[in-house]
Amino acid sequence: EFILIISGSNKSATKLYHQSMNLISRALIVNAIVKWFFMKIAIVRLSALGDIVHSMVVLQFIKKHYPDSVIDWIVEKRFQGVLKSNPHINQIHQVIFSSAKESKSLFLFWNELRKIRKLGKYDLVIDMQGLIKSALVARMISSDMTSGFDKDSLRESLAAIFYKRTYKIDYAENVIRRNLSLVSYALNFSVENESINRKEAFLYSAKEYVYDAVSATKKNILLIPGASYSSKCYPKEKFIELTRQIDANYIIIWGN
């Protein structure tokens, strides 16, 4: 906001007015350019493990178009480890809503939201989860713009009321394309199908790791039998059936 007070003759005042307005216009343009290219962005994707991995794909595209942007991520504490090695993330902010849910405590839930409020101001917040819980988190973050899916693109349609700007993206769309559509709309850039097909692999930057189990002569198929809930686990009988039908080098990954 500018308040311009000019005194003097009409001619000199008019000249000074135009000079002042030119300076103000230039300052506003420079400020807009700096703010746009050096954006501070917060991504909200609290859970779960596989969804976070899918969501991380958008980071490389943001950095391609806005290389000097600063990207922070808000996530449930138990899933923060999967984000740690990504070079595109500036800071990881943890929340513990799971404890509030287990204890059915509104106080704990509100306390976590208050922590989010203290993160500082962002130019843009994008809620990639689209639940009422994540939308509340996104809205609690101080920002110029909060973006998310519109009410017809969400399982919990009420979440859309917490966003300042929403985008219609088919809920049945492939999850990676759906995430990229949201981010590209929010940041005003386009993504070609070929770019999606040639995306960098998850944790592509960890070049120091050598996987001796990878075969140079056979196709390599990676099996991940674990999940955060038993209901999400693919039956072991199905894995066995798959390995019998396809001749390949199978690698199994497991963890806690």
Stretches found by the model and what they are:
Residues 4-256:
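Catalytic machinery of carbohydrate-active enzymes
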